[in-house]
């Protein structure tokens, strides 16, 4: 039964070990404090959530949608961000999702964090209703109930940020995700986090080129880590992808997909912005490309 493992997750709420904490206070720290406080007050029974998931239709295959010989695009519905402020605060998620799909996106990412990104569950559901593409819930997962909520609101994949989670949490949340049919994009920023994600069993790795402390983007980060990602793992490049040249370089390094937000959501013609990024030949092997 779907909830057969639920009891084993009752004790998995774990504070992030100090060795995994960021060296200075960042926007991520503040967000995580808020999300963990919310999770600590959540009195819903996990068994009830597992039972509710059991009544849902199958998910759309997120990881499979990112595989292929040409570069895939995960286009993001993002109203604002802590680093850039308002991007497209009054967007219609259904319209944006359709624009992304017409441009050739293979999946849609939707921010659901409200306080910091002005996202919502309703944005995700509207996007899902508008297109047939897999939907990634982009939020700060700190409890297994966040994973179950993603499934219940209609997501096909969930984000796990390695910098925000302990090894036990990554493994536990991956197990819950797979139990309920979700794929998980495990986000890393360096080789140490990549090793942790792979050891936990991550099947989809996202390398984020944005520094969580300074917001600066290091466009060499993805290519320098590419050769460390096993060929059977789906590799996604995040942040700093602005044009066809960036996309081509990442495809040449062996990345299966790019996740893009600001550059497409603020474009005057979103479908064209997406189409400029798709279709680049993905290298047969992953290696650092300068």
Feature locations, PLM:
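An N-cap/entry alpha-helix motif that binds or orients negatively charged groups
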Residues: 23-90
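Glycine-rich phosphate-binding active-site loops on the catalytic face of alpha/beta enzymes
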Residues: 149-169, 207-214, 255-273
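Conserved, mostly hydrophobic/aromatic
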Residues: 31, 75, 100, 150, ...
